[in-house]
Structure formats: structure tokens, C-alpha cells
């Protein structure tokens, strides 16, 4: 009744925009990591080839020991090309032209060529004893250091190096493949729910990046933070969410009906049970035999206080002897996403499950 009409179909236009955006490469390539092409293999070994986009006139041969750092600089005019013949590094780089640019990490393995664009700060953290060739076009004179070839820019210190050496994940958690591709980087971020007591209090920052495994299509974070740091005192309680509570009430009713669960005999385990939000509906329905497994001490204590029996610890092989087995139903909500040991967790679940369990 307003006399207003859309000139175009809104739903169709939104669909077209999404399709168009999906085809755009929004990632600015600051650094390329390339594998060799035209591989030739025989009983003597392997030959691979790398094509360079510009001529070079100098080659530097560099050996570096595990646990050391190189670079911490940028090149104002030249690309830097490094061909790795042995070892492995974590490369950290950042666009110095853009003040909002995140600090990004990338693994480079033996046989790969790393190309860093001009005005990109970068640092190499050597995770293995490593040998590489520095392929230079132009000057490499130390008298020219800081003018056109290399400008010092320290943005990775020993503390950050040690943190990366400790928690970086080089292989797929699912299949073990080491050829992981970075999909997105949000820079370095504090841990979730990491509430500070003082306004200017410092906290540890970790790369928040997603890597993709081309072999099994698993997506995972580039680092694995010590679970004790994350879960020893977990601040989020699931029962504060009405949506969560209603979801688990409906789930308990559904499982009871579809699986024909016996309220007196059925044994139910919930992995990563938080404050017992998924088990409480079963207790309310009259089930007697339930157990939560929760690594956060404060949440396990809260659940036990509320009469929801909970084991405080991680689901891992060494803890199985402390947990009653032969469960008829095992629950796990958003649990694998929080674990670095996917296979061990799955193995533990099968060991806890009864022969005909679900």
C-alpha cells in the first residue's frame, strides 16, 4: 500500500552477489610457497624443477640449526626467493604497508621455494636443521644493508619463537598428511574466555589460522595450545544458554524413544560434559546411571555439586582405567573440535562403548 516497488528481484540479486564474491580472490599474496614441478624419480632419487619469474645474479648457501631465528627484516625493492633443500621452517610475515595487516605464519618444507614480496616483513623459525639457497637479483652487499636490499625489522622475539616451536601443528590431525594449505589467518589472538584482571595486563597470543588438508579435506587450526591452559579453569558454562538447555532436553527425549533406552539399566556417558547440561535431562527423565567426563576442574566440581556424576580429567588412554566402561550411549557435543588427539579420543570412545552401544 506504500506504492514502493523493488526495481529488481532482491533474492536473485543477493544470490548473484554471493556467486560473484565467491569467485573473487580476496587474499593478498604476500608470500608464495611453491613445490617443484616436472618431478623425475628413479632408484637414485628425485629431480624437481622450479621456474623463476626473473633472473638472479647471486646465490647464498645458508645452514641454520634447529631452534634458531633468521631474517626479522624486509626488502623495500626486491623479492626474496629461498629454495629449501633440507629441513623445515615456520615463516612469519606481515605487510608493513598496511598498519592493520595481521601477522601470518606458513610452514615451508624441504624441496619448496618461498617467494616473499617487497615491503613484507618476514622471519624464519627453524624447526629442523635446515639448508637453503637464497636466490638474489641485485645487490647483496652488507654495505648496502638497510638501504635498498634489506631493512631490519624485528617483530618475532625469542619468546614467540619458543611458543611457535612448542605448539605449531605440522601434520593433519586426521590423516597425518604434511601438505597443509593455509586458508585464512586472523593474526595472533588471545585464548577465548581469557578474561584479564587488570586493564593493561599482558596475555599470551597465538596464531588464529585455519589450514586445509588436501588429502582428507580436514580443516584445522595451525597451532595446538596446551589443553591444560585452555581447560584447567573454563569460564563458559553451557547451562547459561536457554537454547542449549532446550536442545538437550529434546535430544534426551529423542534418544530415549528411538534407541529404546531403559531408565534403570542404560549407562550414558557425555564427553566434554561441561556443567552437565546434556545429562541433566536424562536424570530428570528418571535415568540413574550417567557419567560426565570434563577436564575443567571448576565445571566438574559444579556438576558433581548438582548431583551429576562427573569425572574430572581428559578422555585419554591413561585415564580409561579410572572410568567405568560398557556405556550404552556416548554423547559428545562440539568435542572433537577442541581436541588435538582425534584418533586417541575416538579410540577411547570405542573402548568405553558396549558391544551394542550407540
Tell me the role of every PLM-derived stretch.
Residues 29, 102, 123-164:
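Double-stranded beta-helix
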Residues 343-358:
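A short glycine-rich, Lys/Arg-flanked "PGG" loop and its adjoining helix->strand segment in the class I
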Residues 96-118:
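Short acidic-glycine-tyrosine-enriched beta hairpin
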Residues 60-77:
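Conserved short histidine dyad/triad with adjacent acidic residue
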Residues 77-96:
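Glycine- and acidic-residue-biased ligand/ion/polar-headgroup-sensing regions
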Residues 2-57, 71, 162-163:
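A short, N-terminal "cap"/entry segment at the start of jelly-roll beta-barrel domains
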Residues 167-243:
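N-terminal juxtadomain amphipathic helix
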Residues 331:
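A conserved beta-strand element that flanks and buttresses the S-adenosyl-L-methionine
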